[in-house]
Regions:
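A short, surface-exposed alpha-helical micro-motif characterized by mixed small hydrophobic
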Residues: 220-222
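Helical segment within the ABC ATPase nucleotide-binding domain
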Residues: 191-206
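Conserved catalytic motifs of ABC-family nucleotide-binding domains
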Residues: 173
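Catalytic Walker B motif of ABC-type/P-loop ATPase nucleotide-binding domains
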Residues: 177-181
Length: 273
């Protein structure tokens, strides 16, 4: 891992969401609009060639943080940058450095095949046709989709769609890769391949930076160089697994996680948008 400028920079990041639900609430509250603080003064950096794991219960703010880093949301306070590009003021440049695999939103053309979908997204990234075709074949084979490469995506299972979403995120060999629970719907073989690929190939050989949100503590400990534990919008601890355990006064990562987080109350997906 490099000691150079972080590939991912997060400084005092905060995000508020309005609590009002509709037009009548705005009429009842013309001057004061209550908000919910979803992220609060979050700061950390991720180096080139590093896999950073983001842990935390549902509702902790993980998805909100990843969406800000992916330029899908703007922060209320603080700043964030990818490969030196501010995600608000240089969002187009930041997106060119980024590969993003969200937790649920697939955004595929269901009547097109897996290969046709990847060709489309490769063209959006201005990838040359011949290298793109080779890259698509390689990724589909590695992710176990080679036999379904010409099948319409509407026939894919949830796990197959997840693998295709990962292939799309990897397609243009991004400098920064952001993954939201990428192995949740994967079979053990595909999950093992992805873990190896993230640490050994992307981070180890290509020097890419990977930020992955996960609930799987064993996976996080095996795959990630460092971890951050997020709870109630605040970063409670960060460092290697051993450092996180030391900060929590715990013997294991599972014990540290239990001490650093509160019981889950509501899913993050249920909070106001």
């Amino acid at each position: 891992m490099s000691a150079m400028t972080p590939a991912v920079e997060v400084e005092n990041l905060g995000k508020n969401f309005p609590l009002v639900r509709g037009g009548l609430d705005w009429l009842r509250l013309p001057f004061a609009h209550p908000t919910k603080r979803v992220l609060n003064e979050v700061s950390f950096g991720v180096a080139p060639g590093e896999v950073f794991g983001l842990l935390g219960p549902n509702g902790a703010g993980k998805t909100t943080l990843l969406k800000i880093l992916s330029t899908l949301l703007e922060p209320s306070t603080g700043r964030a940058a990818l490969a030196g590009c501010d995600v608000v003021h240089q969002s187009a440049a930041a997106r060119r450095q980024l590969g993003y695999c969200p937790g649920f939103d697939r955004a595929f053309y269901l009547r097109l095949s897996a290969r046709e979908n990847l060709r489309f997204y490769g063209a959006l990234n201005n990838l040359p046709r011949r290298p793109l075709a080779e890259r698509i074949s390689s990724l589909l084979a590695a992710l176990g989709l080679d036999g379904a490469r010409d099948e319409p995506v509407r026939n894919f299972s949830t796990g197959m769609l997840q693998r295709l979403a990962i292939a799309r995120a990897l397609l243009h060999q991004p400098r920064v890769l952001i993954l939201d629970e990428p192995t949740r719907s994967l079979d053990p073989t595909a999950a093992a391949w992805l873990r190896r690929h993230l640490r050994e190939e992307l981070a180890g050989r290509q020097g890419a930076t990977v930020l992955v949100a996960t609930h799987n503590l064993t996976e996080a400990e095996e795959t990630c160089h460092r971890l951050g534990v997020l709870d109630q919008g605040r970063l409670q601890a960060a460092g290697t697994a051993k450092e996180v355990c030391r900060q929590a006064g715990a013997a294991t990562l599972a014990e540290a996680y239990a001490r650093l987080t509160t019981p889950e109350k509501a899913s993050e997906e249920a909070r106001p948008r």
